[in-house]
């Protein structure tokens, strides 16, 4: 059993990670972090090269048993999150959602929407500053 977090080095990703750590601690289970940054392209990753080291350090300091997954190549973020939940007996998936404009609220991001619709376990959606 595990808690699965879809992670990006953004405020929303940090909120998801914080909520995921709390949930894993409360459920006394493993945290599986799916680092989907590479799906966004090399330019964004190059803008913050230290994020991976900071993420690894934060996970180690948390004391929560964890696994950090790094999908490679051309991949679909939602598919990788769903596969991680299935492969690690996910009890909960945690995603960070961006603030949306009134028109944008009619639509979720494609990754979030697909995970919400296809997940076999509960999905917790958090916003930056609310986790």
PLM regions and their residue ranges:
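Conserved acidic residues
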Residues: 1, 91, 120
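Small/aliphatic-rich secondary-structure junction motif
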Residues: 1-51, 58-67
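Short secondary-structure boundary segments
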Residues: 35-36, 96-98, 127-128
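Structural beta-alpha unit
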Residues: 61-93, 131
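Glycine-rich, Arg-bearing micro-motifs that act as flexible, cationic patches
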Residues: 95-114, 118
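Short, flexible loop segments at boundaries between secondary-structure elements
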Residues: 121-131
């Amino acid at each position: 059993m595990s808690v699965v977090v879809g992670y990006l080095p953004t405020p929303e990703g940090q909120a998801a990670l914080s909520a995921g750590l709390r949930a894993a601690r409360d459920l006394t289970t493993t945290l599986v972090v799916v680092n989907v940054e590479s799906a966004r392209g090399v330019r964004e990753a190059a803008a913050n090269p230290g994020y991976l080291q900071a993420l690894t350090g934060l996970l180690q300091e948390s004391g929560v048993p964890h696994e950090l997954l790094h999908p490679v190549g051309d991949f679909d973020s939602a598919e990788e999150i769903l596969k991680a939940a299935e492969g690690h007996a996910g009890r909960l998936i945690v995603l960070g959602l961006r603030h949306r404009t009134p028109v944008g609220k009619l639509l979720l991001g494609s990754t979030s929407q697909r995970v919400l619709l296809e997940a076999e376990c509960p999905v917790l959606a958090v916003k930056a500053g609310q986790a």
